[in-house]
Amino acid sequence: MSEPITAEKFAIGQSVRRVEDPRLIKGFGRYSDDVNLPRQAYAVVVRSPHAHATIRSIDTSAARKARGVVGVLTGADLAADKLGDLPTDKSRKRRDGSPAYATPRPALARGRARHVGDPVALVVAETMEQAVDAAELVAVDYEPLPSIGATADAIRPGAPAIWAEAPDNVAFVWEAGNKDAVARGFAGAAHVTRLDFVVTRVAAAPMEPRGAVGEWDRRTGRYTLHTGIQAPHGLRTLLADQVFKVPHSDLHVITGEVGGSFGMKSGVYPEPVLVLWAAKRFGRPVKWTSDRREGFVTDEHGRDNVSTAELALDANGKFLALRVAITLNIGAYLTPRSAGPGTNNVGGIAGVYTTPAIHVQTTGVFSNTTPTGPYRGAGRPEATYAIERVIDVAARELKIDSIELRRRNLIPPTAMPFKTGLVFTYDCGDFARGMDMALALADRDGFEKRRAEARRHGKLRGLGIANPIEVAGGPYTAMNPDTASLRVNADGSVSLFTGSTSMGQGNETAFAQIVADRLGVPPERIQVFWGDSDALGAGRGNGGSGALTVGGSAVTRATEKIIERGRRIAARLLEAAPEDIVHKDGKFTVTGTDRGVTLANVARAAYVPRQLPQGMEPGFTEEASFTPPAVTFPNGSQICEIEIDEETGAVRVLRHSVVDDVGRMVNPMLV
């Protein structure tokens, strides 16, 4: 029999197995597709097979007559019901300073489809099979139009316009850094390195596809949406304010388990709108689940930019200035998330180096492709790729060892806090130490011997290094708060409601560890709840590497407020002054004595009015919010050694050495 887990062994800093895993392994998780409601109908979306086309007509007559069909809806029905368009980004500017074109994006396209997969009609039927069959009967007359797929093609002279209102296909232009200082740095440089590079487009493809179930209660006029989303409160707000135009109290979003997201499930998509709208139209719940093929053309894509990086160096190899131009493919629509990867996290282009002057220009361009958004780092990997690759090229041109060139330009720990040449101010970090640890781990000193041995066997061997740094808890310029509500029940058990969602990172375990550590409560008496817009008034959700830094800090503040309330109740029970009460390991004691009561004793009293201090209302619940005063900067060093077969070109990764400075670890097993 395994040893029972105690609060002490479940404390902050302990390696603890994920408490959610037994539930998930046994199949007891509740994902979007697990939601099935009485009288539920099923929806299938008819989508454009063309990248760009005029929609001449939509004939739904045959589909409406098909077996089991509840109804067929088009963009005309959407307009008749006066639903608002999906949110866009109205904060961006074009090159001349004029506002970016706020692309209209109804949940069902009207008049024109602008990418493969653009939704055109919605078929609702009694069963999924009937909905699929009926969808094939919807006859759409398309007139194909010239289209743009490649990023570089979007801004070439004569390129077809995706939007008439943006004839040059430029959605926005954004700049950061000191352009004049960069120009001076390049003017005085002994050497300039230029690198043109492409970061290819990717699809997220999480294990769980997107899905949504919509309900409408005709008695209350209230919508309820079940969907796997990173930020239920944010989605509730956007749908209520901009699409359905109802009070927030009339739209309830519930998120259960989320089977992976990588940023993709934090967007606002047409399908949640469609199932809620259809539920009201037909007076019954409506369910939609994406299949894998559908997801590839409708889930937000990531990356996709064509960029140029220029690095100016003096005669000793010191970095003088860095200039980066990014052409970012945002796809067919300007969404609230389109610009993020090319703007929020470009500060990482400075890397861990002392480059005094940096300038970045990001040009977002339209194309006839699926909209893009944050994906796995949301611009951080692209930023690291830019600086680390241009350093490698400069080292090759100058015939300087690439590690030595990095070392000459690393920010020393004595320079902290360090204001980089681009946006960020690092509060701490010992970057040389991290790199040296990685070099030792990779046995860099023995590399040349291994390379020579590989040559004798007809193999090429190479060693690459990168020193990444990222922002956590951001975005940097708009740090959002998170909320936590903590209730100690009358039996001493604890219920935690958090504004952060869980997408497989182990949040349930980490948050429970914080509560157990702070309150001294055994983990089996802690329940963590998330993903319900009714349970908390606000919530940040999960994204930007902020679940623990922001959400965990909100939980910590809630425990502090619980302890303070408990001190006052304990003082009443122990007939002592509140300032004489201390809390440790789940017990309140009078300073200098052995007199005390447990948290469970205090909780029991908290619900009995006569046992409370004068003026205190019964109950033992506290809510706390946390807005980070600054972001954090996890950093590290990675070294990869590979071997290439000269005859076949086959590449084999031989070793990959990683050192990460992530700060304080709540659970090393989760890091």
Question: Which residue ranges define each predicted feature?
Answer:
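Glycine-rich and small/hydrophobic secondary-structure elements
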Residues: D89-Q130, G263-A315, T372-E397, F418-D443, ...
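Flexible, low-hydrophobicity surface segments
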Residues: M1-D168, F172, L195, E271, ...
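Glycine-rich loop/linker segments at domain edges
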Residues: E20-R23, D89, R95-T103, N169-A212, ...
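Alpha-helical support elements that line or immediately flank enzyme active sites
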Residues: V45-A80, A121-Y142, G211-F282, P336-G348, ...
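Internal maturation/activation junctions in enzymes
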Residues: A452, P578, T591-P634
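Intrinsic disorder at enzyme termini
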Residues: M1-F28, A432-A454, G462, P468, ...
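Helix-loop-helix junctions that connect adjacent transmembrane helices in secondary transporters/permeases
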Residues: G158-F244, P412-S493
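Structured beta-strand/loop patches that form or line metal/cofactor-binding pockets in enzymes
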Residues: V286-A309, V471-G473, E623-E646
